[in-house]
């Protein structure tokens, strides 16, 4: 069975400065993200052992651990792709039109996304996703890595609001981190995810 692996980044750790420091990116990627990858692989191995023993309590525990760590791995993998030293500005084309249609304007979308990010209680994410059932863009606050994000939503743009993503640079002023994020958003990546979600996920939920 193939194991989960830590992806390489498309840019050097310091490439997003001054908006996100190289120190943060190095720790975030090589330590925190790596921990979720290891946690997911460990949970899979323990889940196999528990199934072999028909230990249902252990099965449920390791399914829970797998959900947390695998979601952490998936979210961070998208996070790194959502960022670019050549990012910033605004989306264009079909994504820009869809954002304007769903939220009224890019500025209104940005305000709602910013509010979702900066009011997360505890650890979590802000997420822009494509609703494969309702065929529309939606914003969610994600608690931890996986809670409050409905099945059938394809993530397009994520903002990591765990303290490990910003504290070394921004301390407790997470609002400033959420503002700086817009300077490094890789809209080309978000557009690519939007195009794939809208063209390849029809019928994903109900067939």
UniProtKB/Swiss-Prot annotation:
InterPro entries, per database record: Fe/Mn_Superoxide_Dismutase, Mn/Fe_SOD, Mn/Fe_SOD_BS, Mn/Fe_SOD_C, Mn/Fe_SOD_N, Mn/Fe_SOD_N_sf, SOD_C_sf
Functional description taken from the UniProt entry: Destroys superoxide anion radicals which are normally produced within the cells and which are toxic to biological systems.
Protein name listed in UniProt: Superoxide dismutase [Fe]
Record-listed Fe cation binding positions: 28, 76, 160, 164
Superkingdom of origin organism: Bacteria
A Pfam family reported for this protein in Swiss-Prot or TrEMBL: Sod_Fe_N
Record organism: Mycobacterium bovis (strain ATCC BAA-935 / AF2122/97)
Cofactor names: Fe cation
GO molecular function terms noted in the UniProt entry: metal ion binding; superoxide dismutase activity
Gene Ontology cellular component annotations, sorted alphabetically: extracellular region
Assembly and oligomerization: Homotetramer.
